[in-house]
Amino acid sequence: MRPNRYEDTGNTTGDVSSNTPSTSGRWDLRRLNPPNRLWGSNGVTFGPDGRLYVAQFLAGQISAVDTATGDVDVVVPLDGPVQAPDDLAFGADGSMYIADLTPGRVWRRSPEGAYSLVSDQVQVPNGITCVGDRLFVNEMKMNGRLLELFPDGGDPVVLTDGLALGNAMQLGPDGCLYYPHMIGNQVWRIPPDGGTPELFAEEVDDPVAVRFDRGGVLVVLSRGPAGIVTRIDLATGARSVVVSGVLGLDNAAFDAENRMFVSSFGSGGVTEMREDGRTREIVPRGLSGPFGVTVDLRGTVYAADHYRLASPGDSGEHDSSGVITHELQPFVHGITADDGLLHFASEYGDVRTYDPVHRTTRVRAQGLNEPTGIERSPDGALVVAESGAGRVVRIDGRIDGTDTVTVLAEGLRHPVDIAFDAEGRCYVSDDELGAVLRIDDGGTVTVADGLGAPQGLAVRGDELFTVDVEHRCLRAVSLTTGETRIDAENLAVGLPPGITRTEPALFAAGMPGTPHPFAGLAVAPDGSLLLSANGEGSVLRLSARAPL
């Protein structure tokens, strides 16, 4: 089995390609959850070789899973021409067709492994299916289109438009293409040669994928937290509904024995699901990032995991993935705990405050340019690294419940994370400048430079710690002398060693695209450090050896 950006032995983590464990002479390192072998699992289909092929949008690759053994092999690597695969289908000749969502491309991969571009005229391509030698794709956007594409040349033909976020579709036994409107809770159908689309089913829970089992029954997956699956008899319209508990279902495929295998955009992995909702794990689920990490005063660790708020390991009850999901929270990246509340920053522009007890969310700011790291200042304001604008901003709440946003510093290259020391001084990491800066009276002072690509930032006593993603290490900076040292090496952060790739865009035709990775860092009440090992999908706890 080829490794999938993870190393699956021991209590520490390391570079996948070198199999070198993380090392530190000052800290004991321990994973709070296992590495994610198959994160960002989206479109699934069985290939000519009998394996289940999985499009991994967040990972930027496609893997093949042996459903008998759980073995995973990378087939389309993340440094190839495909950037953000969200769905896939096989043609009659064994060619793989790939919906590359963020750049708006559809690819053909020949049985020999050669790539050719089928179309770049589809916006946010998602659901894709083959009908014999014919190829169809739809758009995951408002007023999206369903099109036929021609791999051997020819302009796309639009069958219909007006889709309210299309997604996984399939030809039914009646000869029509069935597809969901994710916004609107509907399933529609249309003949492959065109015509008037027909509304087939309404009030279907958050439909994200429509599939047909071997008996011709329509199976509709829900993208919600309960993992609802609805079965509909085409002839009678009779329905049955089961709750599987698989959060964030994305797609499904049936094998020759009519066993259903499902993927999860929320937590990855592959799960076999029976008709009554019972499940059997094939590839364990896990964290999709993680991005930012924080810990509250009770010691509960929270990870911002793009689609959800999660806790790893010893933070509470969890499944075999070692992770508990608290809430589906779309597009969370920066995170900080604050007296029973959690504050989120989304790279897509907003800052939110979440009350986990009452499960309420308050929007604090919108329209920011890629806000990433977030921290509460000593006086109660929220301070955010606005990475895309090169700024650090402050969000203050008013008595009337509104908020004001003011600029603390600007002209930075790419600020990523925020931290405060005991005296209330504010620090910011800049991974393009390779430095940590202190904000003084609207300007910045360099605290340490030559740090590679510092991202996650935290202050512990009189030392500042940052995750250097370029060199895959944890760096310590003395706030009294300015001296720096490396405290841990060979961390599984960022891309695997030797891999370079074009970073997909944050937005795609006005829709959320691919998030930018962010390796967060936090200090726990007991003085340990929590680190987002986003190269493998785990959270690390670093406990100081005595004496430090």
Question: Locations of the language-model features?
Answer:
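Sequence/structural signature of beta-propeller modules
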Residues: M1-G25, R545-L548
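A short helix->beta-strand "capping" segment at the edge of beta-propeller domains
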Residues: G14-R37, R501-A508
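Beta-strand-rich domains and repeat architectures in extracellular enzymes and scaffolds
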Residues: L32-Q61, A533-S538
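Structural signal for beta-propeller blades
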Residues: G60-I62, G104-V106, N143-L146, N185-V187, ...
